[in-house]
Regions:
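Alpha-helical structural modules in large enzymes and assemblies
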Residues: 1-417
Length: 417
């Protein structure tokens, strides 16, 4: 059945005019390096994501090794490298190295591929730039803990796991009672000022977590993700103004506690540090240049930049097509441009190349969760990760018409007409 699913995915991918890849290498709980490759294609009048393959890195995890696996699989799948318009990665040295990284080898095959750094995996600017007072509180909560690295990793890299901190804070009363009974030496955990600092950390990481989850999903693209990052940056400016006025509505847990003057100053300083580093880690994309992609009927073609003459000509014709204008209001942006491709191919393909690339590795996180389950000690049978990962694909169900019935199946009798 997994072979049937793989065959469907490969056929759909080959039929797509263009495709984008998303890949990442990580080590599973057995210590084995796994490479997940996802593909985004145009299929069934929409843009869809799918797991292309999961490959084990048997020896080293160098950029050249990753390139060889990707390149060989694309050859096996009959997917021309020149049809790939973008690759989204987590920005690890093996991927981004200018000489021996995956990107350098790939550029030799197709210099037009656009590489993007996953929005979710840009290291949180909050970990290294948090005010010293908060960093001390955050660090002491992880001290002497076997899971300290997991907690930091959770809050910094995979922010959806930031719930760990929320759970810790919400159990503060129970923790204090337990430590009192046990006569614990960690006296700072009974310090109200310390818990007030933790309350702010919990609130700010919750905001970061919401931002993180908002840029996930199959309908996300670079434009929508950029919108949300820009909105968050503007909110930080608003929050600092409110904090300077001693208004903490945006930090509900902090607002419930006795906030002293020094803490207000620390919060204000931390928000500014976060804003500065957000600007550094998430460079501004001039999304205004792509308003024609979001709504081609509301822009002046003379103001659109970056288009060739033939594309501008196509856009003018499309903009004045009343039938398409009505269709636009009935469809998603992705479906609209795929629909318009038949009549206006040049401008439609230009739009699709902007919408198609991945902006996040959210499926990567789901994929490695599946891999963890596959190799769990609870499994009572031996099967390779690659085989099992085929069954974890999110594509349409396998073609069961070609699957033989189980042995011993009894078919009902039918009367002859």
């Amino acid at each position: 059945m997994s072979e049937d699913i793989e065959e469907q995915v490969l056929q759909q991918s080959c039929d797509s005019l263009l495709f984008a890849l998303r890949l990442d290498e990580s080590t599973d709980i057995s210590g084995q390096a796994q490479l997940l490759i996802f593909i985004r294609i145009v299929y069934n009048e929409d843009i869809v994501d799918n797991l292309l393959c999961c490959k084990t890195l048997s020896e080293t995890t160098k950029g050249e090794d990753i390139f060889e696996i990707v390149n060989n699989y694309l050859k096996f799948a009959n997917l021309p490298c020149d049809k790939c318009i973008g690759v989204c990665t987590d920005g690890s040295p093996a991927i981004t190295g200018s000489v021996k990284g995956f990107t350098s080898f790939t550029k030799k095959k197709n210099e037009n591929i656009i590489f993007t750094h996953c929005f979710l995996h840009r290291r949180s600017p909050y970990d290294k730039n948090i005010s010293r007072g908060f960093k001390k509180s955050f660090g002491s909560s992880c001290e002497n803990s076997d899971n300290s690295k997991l907690l930091f990793h959770s809050a910094i890299r995979w922010l959806s796991r930031g719930r760990v901190l929320s759970r810790f804070y919400d159990l503060s009363e129970e923790i204090i009672v337990f430590l009192t009974i046990e006569e614990s030496k960690y006296k700072f955990l009974r310090d109200e000022k310390w818990w007030t600092k933790v309350s702010f950390l919990t609130d700010i990481f919750e905001h970061l977590n919401k931002l993180n989850t908002s840029v996930q999903g199959c309908n996300e693209n670079i434009l929508t993700s950029t919108d949300k990052i820009m909105a968050f940056n503007e909110k930080l400016t608003l929050w600092k103004t409110q904090v300077d006025q001693k208004k903490l509505t945006m930090f509900p847990r902090t607002a419930e506690r006795d906030v002293y003057a020094r803490l207000v100053s620390l919060i204000s300083e931390s928000i500014m540090l976060l804003k500065d580093k957000m600007t550094k880690y998430f460079p501004s994309v001039n999304v205004d240049d792509y308003d024609w992609v979001r709504n081609p009927f509301s822009v002046s073609v003379n103001e659109v930049i970056g288009l060739r003459f033939s594309e501008e000509d196509n856009l003018i014709s499309l903009k004045n097509d009343r039938t398409l204008n009505l269709k636009f209001n009935e469809m998603t942006v992705n479906k609209f441009w795929i629909y318009a491709q038949a009549e206006f191919p040049e401008i439609s393909i230009k739009a699709i190349t902007i919408l198609l690339p991945f902006s996040t590795l959210y499926l990567r996180e789901q994929g490695f969760s599946a891999v963890t389950t596959i190799i769990s000690k609870k499994r009572e049978r031996l099967r390779s990760v690659e085989e099992d990962s085929e069954d974890s694909r999110t594509c349409p169900p396998p073609d069961t018409m070609d699957v033989p019935p189980p042995k011993g199946t009894i078919f009902p009798r039918t009367k002859n007409k």
